């Protein structure tokens, strides 16, 4: 883009328009039946649309039941003539109204038709809460969108911390320290760097102590029952009607249609009264019908009174006194249950996350007669609205104007909503296809080749193209490339290429079967469209073709492909009209134009701009479509040649292994960067590139470097035939080598410095971001062990070198001491001639000598402090991160292999026995210690319906399944599991979870046990519970009073088990959906502009843009969406960085709730959101809230990984630091010791971070006045630093001085104590002043794993660790610390930088 500057300016103007629209007040006159005064004022602006107004009316209580109305501008202009997406500014301009600040709008009711009645019914169901009930039956699984956030019981977010910090800042400014920013920053909500925490009350300290105890005693393994105690906010909502449905008298008979009747309804109120209602074009009224008599006329009583209203809601409010009151009570209950509406809001364009383990008590069904009628009232008067031309709709939306912000926003919003609607419709149909509820179009074919057409969508098995890959893996290859095709479609959609379209696509995996869902190319079932070249051909060509054989004509009619390899693979088609649009696609994927030759008969005449397997088709809508985009990345030829051996047992499953787009893009960037560097160097040598605009060159005329980036491309068809150039093959081989030679080593190296993943899904996402395919997991696991061994060797080498260096330094010290001893001896001889002093004088002399020595060292220590080099310590949990990465890699390989084994089992198993097969598989895999030959639960009657081969899964044993999984790991990941790997290498509870998530299984919440000891203990408890239950039942029968009905809980504990799982433990299966939705570029552009404004110093505009961007995210994605959740978390981080701690804390809480509901209650994004939220609460000085959130995060990663995750060290350190600053030293000491223990267990005892914890513990002990005990910790820290950092490192030097000063202080105390026995204590204590800063050591806290660090002030070395100053006996702790640190004045306290997740 040569005109880059103009584009940037346009974007900035657009962003400016986002945050500064012209304001407009809407003065709305309502119909008289709503409000006699009829006035409603709504603030708006010129950029809002009629759609925005309608959405606003749906949330205002007074107008929310309105559905069928006209909107008149200035009392006469109907907005329907303008359209709903037109802005008020455009309407005002069209009507030539000038620039009014107020716009007169009138709402006028319209006569109902049947479609409008359906809309009114749907709105009523939403208002009364029936749509929450619908969710249960319409969901693709059970308990979607659960959350546990409200159970934490956080204190409200307050701004208390800001005031406290501000006061501390003023004190620091008086001392000339800790000054950051301008004094008036407090007014803008910014906070300054400080560590001061509010003084805590006794009650707060007790609360913190209890939370610390919870953290210490947190269980090591997952408790499934506790983990599924979800919030039940919606369960508190009461439906204000007992029954509401379309009446049995519907549809309206012909003789009543002429009277205006549209539909008949039946309602039963909470007062147990039943009313029959007529839906009339004038409104709704109670009629004279009964269950047996049809009379739809208006019902009047003897006084002539009747019930009629234009709005159904208002009519029901007249009929039932409890109706409105119940709705109001529901709203109160919801608001009191949680301060976060995100907890119960329903998504409008995304799926909720379904938990893999479900509390059985949450599995409820609520009666609702109208629920089964939703298909009737939701899809138009004849049900035809469910059938859509999906491709045509999406392409039409993409072609909408996008010249300004509002147009782009509306366009992106419509596209995202339609893509979700497609995915939802396709997923529901795919499930019905798998269950056999829909007939195929080709019933005679094999099951894997069946295709379906339903509701405008084509469905096929993921293996339907198996014939195309018969030599490269067949079914496995076909299944694999379908996902690669979808990945390419998402990229094309995001780039919004003009002139070429892709198919709306999603992939559904359900119960081990895959269905590919695609909206067909318009007209694909019609006769083949002529290409543009054929259109230009004359009549003479047509006459020549008349002589062709009839079969050739039929073949031409069937051929739909106009570009690429023909359907029968017999020729290469090259419609020139496709070249230009496909050229855009090739630029996105860096494809090289190339000739194709498969044989002498099948070859291209010119160069194809895309792969031969990418086909160009033309729809009857006139658009050009590109399909089969899986070949937009090259083959991973190095991997294929090494591991795919067709026909061999140990071969990789298929030969279609492709490189990820991320890897290709990274390779391309580095190649272009190398070209740029080479070209720059060349021009500089030739003198053609002037540096810094020398010779008076104008900035606009600076030299530009033209790079031949089109040469950095590859042939996607390389290695597909024998007729290819060596250059093309070499380029593809280079990209293939790039993964193992560059990307994987860089990934492993980076793992040293960052927090380890929490589960296999996060590991997979990280690998994908790096461009690494999961088939390299085995290689990564092997390399991790190699890198770990190398690191350990380097540490051992470092220790040996430092030990030798220590000996040298000790020898130097001995020599120095010898010389000093000689000097002392001479001084002693000179002093011998003087009179002998008393013991009191000697003690005083000791003190004075100590003072003198300390004073003598002060100047040199001050100088040393100024010139102190930065320590080379990194405090990274390298070994712990390597171990975690290795463990997760093994677990992910085993989980994925288990999924494939289970998929093969399910392929032969009838759907009716799926739960039994899955439970048996899990017993065989995970229950080997309990029962090596578990029995499958198959009822003889059920078995009689199927063949023996269909129930062959029952013959599986523990040994069989473990061997199959190990074989899959070997073939798919090229990794050999060691013997007894199931006991040694994987953690069974976490593997259980991973398989459930990957296969889409929902289990009942139950304390599943995986060891023989735990299982037997569980069985004994079950027997005891059974005895208690029987006693209670007998007692209840004798009771005169009836106990209230309890919800049915399908308890799997009612009988003794012989294995871990039973079929009844499985609640159900959920589909795993991959869709073609994408992130619009609009939000990225605005966010980039907002960050730019913030960095440039315009914080008001930047913050306003961020706030508006939150609204944009909610408009495009909906409030309940994973993308919205991630953006909330991002905005919270920005707020915190700017010092808006309160706002960050509020936004962080919202991010947690949305992550739980849209990502999963124990998803890694949710864990990160909890940790970030804890950090934001801590920054806002709400320590108790922070501890509660950290505790929940730890409980979550215990279920996904185990408590011993490296993040445990991070959490314990952050919490301990917080308690230390709050002066709760006892709790801080407990957690620092726990952090040291965890660090020693995970990362070894001799590590830099272990030394740091010893140092922190010593500081706490000093704060507690346990001086002698602190010396041991200082010594331990010093020994570690000497070994790992060397004797010359600043940390080693400082800890050595600490040890010396502590020893000196102990000597000082002893001398003072001896003197105090002889004489009264002095009125003033003069402390030694050897200046050694304790905080210089702790300032360099781990920057890798978030173990806490201190912020440096504008690049200067931070020399201040917070110390306490409670008053004690004759001295304060501050005096003690000043002595230990050697300072005459306390340093400014620095803020602990707790690492965010």
From Swiss-Prot:
It comes from the Eukaryota. Its main location: cytoplasm. GO terms for molecular function: mRNA binding. Residues 1314-1338, 1362-1373 have a biased composition (Polar residues). Residues 1034-1043, 1386-1397 have a biased composition (Basic residues). InterPro entries: CLU-central, CLU_dom, CLU_N, CLU_prot, GSKIP_dom_sf, TPR-like_helical_dom_sf. Residues 368-640 form the Clu domain. Residues 158-203, 526-555, 686-707, 812-869, 1019-1050, 1314-1397 are annotated as: Disordered. Pfam families: CLU, CLU_N, eIF3_p135, TPR_12. Keywords: Cytoplasm, Repeat, TPR repeat. TPR repeats lie at residues 30-63, 559-595, 1167-1200, 1209-1242. It is found in: Cytoplasm. One of its GO terms (cellular component) is cytoplasm. GO terms for biological process: intracellular distribution of mitochondria; mitochondrion organization. Residues 161-203, 686-703, 812-831, 839-860, 1019-1033, 1375-1384 have a biased composition (Basic and acidic residues). Belongs to the CLU family. May associate with the eukaryotic translation initiation factor 3 (eIF-3) complex. PANTHER family: CLUSTERED MITOCHONDRIA PROTEIN HOMOLOG, EUKARYOTIC TRANSLATION INITIATION FACTOR 3 SUBUNIT EIF-3. mRNA-binding protein involved in proper cytoplasmic distribution of mitochondria. This is Clustered mitochondria protein homolog. It comes from Lodderomyces elongisporus (strain ATCC 11503 / CBS 2605 / JCM 1781 / NBRC 1676 / NRRL YB-4239) (Yeast).
């Amino acid at each position: 883009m040569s005109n880059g500057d103009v584009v940037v300016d346009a974007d900035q103007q657009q962003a400016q328009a986002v945050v500064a629209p012209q304001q407009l007040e809407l003065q709305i006159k309502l119909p008289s039946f709503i409000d006699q005064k009829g006035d409603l004022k709504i603030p708006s602006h010129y950029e809002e649309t009629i759609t925005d107004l309608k959405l606003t009316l749906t949330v205002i209580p007074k107008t929310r039941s309105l559905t069928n109305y006209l909107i008149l501008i200035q009392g006469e202009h109907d907005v329907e003539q303008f359209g709903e997406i037109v802005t008020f500014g455009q309407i005002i301009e069209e009507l030539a109204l000038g620039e009014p600040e107020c716009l007169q709008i009138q709402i006028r009711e319209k006569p109902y038709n049947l479609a409008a009645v359906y809309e009114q019914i749907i709105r009523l169901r939403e208002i009364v809460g029936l749509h929450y009930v619908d969710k249960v039956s319409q969901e693709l699984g059970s308990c979607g969108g659960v959350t546990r956030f409200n159970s934490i019981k956080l204190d409200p977010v307050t701004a208390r911390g800001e005031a406290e910090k501000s006061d501390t800042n003023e004190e620091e400014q008086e001392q000339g320290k800790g000054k950051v920013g301008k004094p008036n920053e407090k007014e803008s909500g910014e906070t300054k760097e400080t560590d001061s925490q509010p003084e805590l009350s006794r009650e707060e300290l007790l609360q913190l102590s209890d939370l610390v105890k919870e953290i210490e005693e947190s269980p090591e393994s997952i408790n499934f029952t506790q983990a599924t105690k979800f919030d039940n906010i919606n369960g508190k909502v009461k439906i204000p009607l007992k029954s509401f449905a379309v009446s049995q008298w519907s549809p309206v008979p012909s003789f009543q249609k002429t009277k205006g009747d549209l539909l008949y309804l039946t309602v039963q109120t909470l007062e147990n009264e039943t009313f029959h209602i007529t839906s009339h074009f004038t409104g709704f009224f109670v009629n004279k019908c009964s269950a047996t008599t049809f009379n739809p006329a208006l019902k009047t009583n003897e006084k002539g009174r009747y019930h009629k209203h234009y709005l159904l809601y208002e009519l029901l409010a007249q009929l039932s006194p409890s109706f409105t009151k119940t709705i109001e009570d529901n709203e109160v209950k919801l608001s009191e249950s949680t301060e976060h509406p995100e907890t119960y809001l329903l998504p409008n364009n995304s799926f909720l996350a379904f938990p893999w383990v479900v509390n059985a008590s949450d599995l409820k069904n609520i009666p609702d007669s109208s629920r089964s009628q939703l298909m009737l009232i939701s899809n138009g008067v004849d049900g035809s609205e469910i059938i859509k031309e999906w491709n045509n709709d999406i392409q039409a939306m993409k072609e909408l104007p996008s010249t300004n912000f509002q147009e782009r926003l509306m366009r992106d919003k419509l596209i995202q909503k339609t893509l979700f609607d497609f995915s939802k419709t396709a997923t529901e149909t795919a499930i019905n296809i798998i269950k056999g509820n829909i007939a195929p179009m080709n019933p005679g074919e094999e099951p894997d080749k069946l295709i379906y057409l339903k509701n405008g969508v084509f469905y096929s098995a993921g293996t339907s193209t198996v014939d195309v890959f018969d030599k490269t893996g067949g079914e496995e290859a076909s299944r694999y490339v379908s996902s690669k095709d979808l990945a390419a479609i998402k990229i094309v959609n995001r780039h919004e290429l003009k002139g070429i379209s892709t198919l709306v696509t999603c992939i559904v995996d359900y119960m081990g079967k895959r269905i590919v869902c695609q909206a067909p190319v318009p007209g694909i079932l019609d006769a083949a469209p002529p290409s543009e070249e054929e259109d230009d051909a004359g009549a003479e060509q047509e006459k020549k073709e008349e002589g062709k054989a009839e079969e050739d004509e039929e073949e031409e009619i069937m051929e739909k492909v106009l570009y690429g390899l023909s359907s029968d693979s017999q020729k290469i088609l090259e419609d020139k009209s496709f070249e230009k649009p496909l050229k855009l696609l090739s630029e996105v994927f860096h494809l090289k134009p190339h000739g194709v030759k498969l044989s002498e008969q099948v070859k291209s005449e010119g160069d194809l701009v895309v792969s031969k397997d990418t086909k160009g088709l033309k729809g009857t809508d006139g658009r050009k479509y590109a399909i089969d985009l899986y070949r937009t990345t090259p083959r991973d030829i190095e991997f294929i040649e090494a591991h795919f051996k067709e026909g061999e047992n140990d071969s990789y499953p298929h030969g279609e292994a492709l490189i990820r787009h991320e890897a290709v893009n990274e390779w391309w960037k580095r190649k272009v960067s190398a070209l740029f560097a080479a070209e720059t160097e060349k021009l500089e040598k030739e003198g053609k590139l002037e540096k810094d605009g020398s010779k008076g060159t104008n900035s606009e005329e600076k030299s530009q470097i033209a790079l031949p980036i089109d040469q950095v491309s590859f042939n996607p068809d390389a290695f597909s035939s024998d007729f290819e150039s060596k250059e093309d093959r070499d380029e593809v081989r280079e990209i293939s080598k790039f993964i193992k030679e560059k990307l994987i080593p860089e990934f492993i190296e980076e793992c040293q410095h960052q927090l380890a993943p929490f589960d296999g899904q996060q590991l997979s996402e990280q690998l994908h971001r790096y461009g690494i395919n999961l088939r390299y997991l085995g290689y990564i696991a092997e390399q991790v062990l190699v890198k770990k061994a190398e690191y350990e060797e380097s540490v051992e080498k470092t220790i040996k070198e430092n030990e030798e260096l220590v000996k040298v330094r000790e020898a130097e010290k001995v020599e120095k001491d010898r010389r000093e001893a000689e000097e002392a001896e001479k001084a002693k001889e000179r002093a011998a001639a003087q009179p002998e002093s008393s013991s009191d004088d000697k003690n005083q002399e000791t003190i004075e000598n100590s003072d003198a020595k300390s004073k003598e060292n002060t100047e040199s220590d001050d100088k040393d402090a100024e010139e102190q080099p930065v320590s080379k310590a990194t405090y990274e949990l390298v070994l712990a991160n390597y171990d975690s990465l290795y463990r997760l890699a093994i677990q992910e390989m085993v989980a994925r292999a288990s999924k494939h084994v289970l998929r093969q089992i399910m392929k032969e198993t009838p759907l009716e026995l799926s739960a039994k097969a899955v439970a048996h598989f899990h017993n065989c895999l995970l229950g080997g210690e309990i029962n090596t030959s578990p029995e499958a639960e198959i009822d003889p009657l059920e078995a009689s319906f199927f063949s023996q081969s269909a129930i062959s899964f029952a013959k599986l044993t523990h040994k069989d399944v473990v061997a199959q999984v190990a074989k899959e790991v070997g073939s798919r990941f090229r990794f050999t599991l060691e013997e007894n790997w199931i006991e040694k290498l994987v953690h069974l509870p976490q593997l259980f979870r991973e398989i459930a998530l990957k296969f889409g299984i929902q289990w009942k919440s139950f304390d599943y046990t995986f060891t023989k000891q735990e299982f037997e203990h569980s069985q004994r408890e079950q027997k005891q519970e059974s005895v208690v239950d029987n006693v209670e039942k007998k007692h209840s029968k004798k009771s005169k009073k009836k106990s209230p009905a309890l919800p049915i809980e399908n308890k799997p504990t009612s009988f003794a088990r012989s294995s871990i799982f039973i079929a009844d433990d499985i609640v159900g299966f959920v589909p795993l959906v991959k869709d073609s939705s994408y992130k619009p570029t609009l939000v990225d552009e605005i966010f980039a502009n907002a960050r730019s404004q913030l960095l440039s110093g315009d914080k008001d505009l930047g913050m306003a843009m961020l706030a508006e961007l939150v609204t944009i995210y909610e408009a495009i994605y909906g409030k309940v969406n994973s993308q919205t959740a991630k953006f909330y978390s991002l905005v919270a981080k920005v707020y915190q960085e700017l010092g808006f701690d309160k706002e960050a804390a509020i936004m962080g809480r919202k991010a947690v709730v949305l992550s739980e509901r849209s990502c999963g209650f124990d998803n890694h994004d949710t864990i990160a959101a909890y940790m970030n939220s804890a950090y934001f609460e801590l920054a806002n000085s709400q320590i108790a809230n922070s501890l509660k959130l950290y505790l929940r995060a730890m409980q979550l990663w215990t279920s996904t990984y185990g408590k011993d995750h490296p993040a445990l060290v991070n959490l314990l350190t952050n919490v301990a630091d917080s308690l230390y600053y709050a002066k709760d030293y006892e709790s801080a000491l407990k957690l620092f010791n726990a952090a040291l223990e965890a660090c020693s267990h995970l990362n070894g005892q001799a590590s830099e971070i272990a030394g740091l914890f010893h140092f922190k513990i010593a500081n706490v002990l000093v704060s507690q006045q346990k001086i002698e005990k602190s010396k041991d910790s200082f010594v331990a820290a010093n020994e570690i630093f000497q070994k790992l950092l060397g004797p010359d490192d600043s940390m080693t030097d400082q800890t050595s001085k600490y040890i010396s000063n502590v020893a000196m202080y102990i000597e000082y105390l002893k001398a003072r104590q001896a003197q105090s026995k002889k004489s009264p204590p002095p009125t003033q204590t003069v402390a030694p002043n050897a200046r050694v800063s304790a905080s210089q050591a702790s300032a360099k806290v781990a920057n890798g794993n978030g173990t806490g660090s201190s912020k440096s002030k504008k690049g200067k070395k931070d020399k201040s660790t917070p110390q306490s100053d409670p008053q004690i006996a004759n001295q304060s702790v501050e005096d003690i610390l000043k002595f230990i640190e050697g300072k005459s004045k306390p340093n400014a306290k620095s803020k602990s930088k707790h690492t965010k997740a």
